[in-house]
Amino acid sequence: MTPHAAHSRPHPDAHCVFCAHDTLDVVLEETEHFLVIADHAPLAEGHLLIVPRDHFACYGALPQELDDEAHNLRERATRFLTSAYRPPIFFEHGVFRQTVSHAHLHALPLGAASHGFADEVGRIGRPAPSLDALRAWYAEQGHYFYLETERKETGEREALLFPPEMDVYFRVMGTLRDHTAHTAAWVPPALRQMQGGAKMRALAAAWHTYFEDRD
């Protein structure tokens, strides 16, 4: 077994902003093992993160007993974002290109991807129908880039894993921009953070309004 395959519960990291839960700006929801938070440098209004409370390196390191809870939060985020904004994409850098070294899944309401997107990037990605696929890749190869989109033509969701290579990453994300309804603010994080306060507050208000009549 490689070091990547061990799933023992990690200790909090004193230097990790996601471990210091009380310092997070906008927490939308808390469950036993996860937090749903507004991204502090949003690419678009509605950009949120699903973050495990424990300090796992990436979703490929999550133990199976957290799968149902993680899935339920993804479904919850999908329903909310589709209703309040547009269908989301989910992506995770899987240690590769992480700005915080703590697992976090991005949900970004860019809209469904056209058929052309799947045709262009499907050839270089590996299907990832469950978290088991992430765990297998992480145990065997370490870093990865994960992306899940909704097909515009069918409404079905499709998840792919990509090798952690910069040219692949920029090709996939560039193609995604060309095949979704909404163009996110692909600007430097510092500028997004400076402009993000209003978007975070708007997201929090929309989240609580949406769920107050449904929970």
Residue locations for each model-derived region?
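HIT superfamily nucleotide-processing domains
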Residues: M1-D215
